[in-house]
Amino acid sequence: MRHYIAIIVLFFQAHFISAQSVGKWSFSSQQLPVYEYTGRLPNIVLDKLGKDSYIQTDPYFLLGNYRLSLFVHASGIYQFMTGERAWARVNADENQQNYGSNNAQIIVKKGKNYKKTDLIGLKSIAIDTQRTQKLFGVGFAKYTYRLDEDLSCQRVISVKPSTKINTGNPAFVVSVTLKNSGKVVQELTYSEGMKLNYTPSAIQLYEPTKRPVSYLHKISVDKSTKTTIANLTCTPNLFLNFPSKNQRYIYDVNPPNVFMSTKSFDKDIKSYITVNHDTLSAHLTTILKPGETHTFHIIVGLNYENSKQAIQEQINELLANVNPSNNNEGFYQTAWKKQLPDFTAEKDQIIKREMLWNAYTLEAMATYCAYYGETIIPQGTIYAYHFGDNISNRDHLQAALPVCYTNPNLAKSIIRYVIMHSETDGEIKRGDAGNGCTPPSLYKESDEQLYFFNTLSQYLASTKDYAFLNEKVWLYPAENKKGEVVLNILKNYFVYLRDEIGRGSNGLVKMLNSDWSDSFFHENSPNVYAATAESHLNSVMVLAIFPKLITELKKSKNPEATALIIALENYRKEVSEAYFKDFGNRKFSARAYLNHRKKYGIDNVCIEPQGYLLQIPDLSISRKKEIYQYVKSKIYSPEKIGFRTREKPLWSTTGEGEDGGIWFSLEGSLIAGVATFDKQEAKELLHTISFQNFTDQYPSIWLGQWTGGDNVNSTLSQRDGLCFFWEKDRPNVFQGFCSHPHAWPLYCYLKIKE
């Protein structure tokens, strides 16, 4: 009986105690967003039926630059990740996927006794909300611990921004400040360690003894510089034929070196480095007199040069021009301020805060890919951070849309990266895994070229960089260094769209085996329907995007574009005639015709094509308003945070995921469509998909209050407010920080402001 009572108590605690908000926002001294996490730890989130949410119980934020990704948890745990050669955790926790292994403790001498306090983890002082404050801002995380009435410890993690494409310092600083507010001397030792366990995301799903490769390390300690360096090597556990380090490969055969160093500008602090098996640790011992404050710094990072001198230069660069005693908001607030757009004029404080946060998050997510020599914004979430895949290229192209305004060089790098996945016939590979490896895929996507046209059009419109059309970019595989000028690649993309993807019996653009929806054929075999399936979404994308592309090509005044412009205009006209013949006097677009009998979205509103339908420039405003009001009446109410994908599910009973959920990429395209005829309504919709509105609607669900996945379940589901996650046997591992809930709101905001 006691067992059942305990379960009931936990259930009600999870539902009712957590019904309060888990934190609050403010602004830093540089007027950048800061979030204070005040929720409980562990933060257990359940659905309406009391079932597991799959969300981690230790909420996390993201610090990063183009060469490192650092997920900092509310408990002080961090996941130190790199995506430079392959997505991998440097300090992976073998007991829990998508989690890190690090520790910190402080030992205070009390007479002849010693009192030890653990600072990090779900069994530490961090779970005590009365004794620990947790702040997460732009480029920093700050944990303040009240050890007793007189002694406090502040631990600040700082990440320096990248200011140029393909560059950045892949290291972070942990600054520890100890303060004695009492009247007696305090003698203490502080220690902080990180377990070295380099584990690519793609192989974390294997049991350690069954992994195809292992990463071994040889550790050395340089006492003179107080630095320890771990040289990593990749070793096969079964027969493999390793390539050279610069060739594409599913595994990273050239992992980085990992280092930890300690630095103090305070002569009263004794600091040193130790190694215990696979754990790198930094320590300080000091005596704090009444009223004294002592600070020391730990630098943890990656280095690819296998050089002690290079590591010291990296450390020096990280600490150059910083005030070591002024780290209350991290070391790099001023640098981050310069890197982000200026939204000072925005009077709506929620929108101002969230757009700054979104711009920062995209910069923190952006990742240099060594194989391609380009920097991208990955889709992130479970794709990159859980499975280790940079998929799909259409997602990277969508993430590039807002940075066409905020960081055009980054947008250009993303466009170049996508081109490097292209065959000479105009096919664009879906994405890659490992170090530039493109594994065989069951998907033959029909829309990559359309998303490319959209992003290139926006880039050209924003930058007027028409010379880009004459630049040469490597084609697939990039290591062969065989390239073509962008304009010719653009021509190949169009020919591929027209001839390989083609159009069906109704004159609509075909679907092949997937358009935006990867799941559309889960219930319908592509072997049966791929030859006939037509996509209304692809068709309206042509009608919405081609006019923009044609306009920019004309503005380029490039004589080599003349024939392409004519071909684009003719194709757009043909698709327009076919689409509007099918559309007739309907009040919403159909979704797809798999053949002449199997038609979807005829009497059931599906969101996918509606946003691009509203973006078609020669569709009258009165018709757009009529369409929008009807669509809104069918899939907006009674939703709390946006439009769901379906009026009624097409193939499922739960109405989750692509068959009834709320998807930020679709919300964004719809808002962009509404902005073409009613900017005030578009602003209101922007508030609807905001993190603040999610917090108001779902205060107990932390994932969605400052980041999220690519989707959220709608009210059709018993799990509304939660992300759809198909890995049912992997509880508490869902990794957020998808680019879409950051990129699309920011892009829509910038479009509305035009």
Regions found by a protein language model. Give the residues of each.
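Low-complexity, Ser/Thr/Pro/Gly-enriched N-terminal "stalk/linker" regions
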Residues: 21, 36, 324-387, 413, ...
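C-terminal capping/lid segments that line or modulate ligand- or cofactor-binding pockets
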Residues: 23-42, 54-78, 358, 388-391, ...
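Extended, loop-rich substrate-binding clefts of extracytoplasmic carbohydrate-active enzymes
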Residues: 111-171, 264-282
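Beta-strand-rich recognition/accessory modules
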Residues: 171, 251-328, 529-532, 545
